[in-house]
Amino acid sequence: MEQRCFLGESSIENLLLVLKEFSFSHLFLVRGRNSYETCGAKSIMTAVFSELDCEVTEYFDFEENPKIEDLERGLLLLRKYSCSVIVAVGGGSVLDMAKLLRFFYSYSGEPTSGKFEKEKDLLPLIVLPTTAGTGSEATHFAVLYKNKVKYSVEHNAILPDVAIVYPPFTYNTPRYLTACAGFDALAQAIEAYWNAYATKESDEFAKRAIELLWPNLPLVVNSPTNSMRNKVSEGAYWAGRAINITKTTAPHAFSYSFTTY
């Protein structure tokens, strides 16, 4: 599945144009509980939605590390209102939740089984990251917790249709979160580059990510400028593109034990 991506400070201008490509009367918005407003997304998204003749149902009542119960609750809401397009605005967990909702709305199967059956067409999914780190906007994986154990759900249909990487959403990110998210992106780029399944294309994406992240990440943590934020956002996207091809290796395998609770 091919994904469309818009990068940079003018990328947000494409959101309304993309939404107008689809025929729908009810939009499902998956968003962060607090970040949606603090990053400046709320005013922008409200203005865009006002240009559309549609209702909007919001879903934000879920854990930072989404649980299977959060997924089930979101699916009930999505089905109740018969929404026909999904937009996600938030960090990695928000984007993962939207990806899982879109996937399991159309596919049956126990989320941690790895065995899924398509039952109906996928809903369009547009994602807008508000952090520069996970690369979730560019991958066909999503993380889910079941009984306090971390699982990765993988399927080509999990990849969002459209990613809009609008760096200004990251301009107010706190220092600690900037560092954690940025190091996540750098680690994924390196992990993809040394991967046994690396390809010419994944190497190109990984190198592009490293070239953007390596010099700018320390600066964006200690004395950020908008230009640096732009480069780190772009680097995180390319890191996601790289690891989407190679998949993960030992660092991610170790992380599952560290992040299970």
Can you annotate each of these PLM segments?
Residues 1-85:
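ATP/NTP phosphate-donor binding region
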Residues 69-167:
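Glycine/threonine-rich beta-strand-loop-alpha-helix active-site module
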Residues 141-246:
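Carboxylate- and glycine-rich phosphate/diphosphate-binding segment that chelates Mg2+/Mn2+
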Residues 6-8, 58-60, 87, 127-128, ...:
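General beta-strand structural signal in soluble alpha/beta enzymes
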Residues 256-261:
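Catalytic phosphate/nucleotide-handling subdomain of diverse soluble enzymes
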Residues 63, 89-91, 247-251:
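Active-site nucleophile and cofactor-binding loops and adjacent substrate-binding regions
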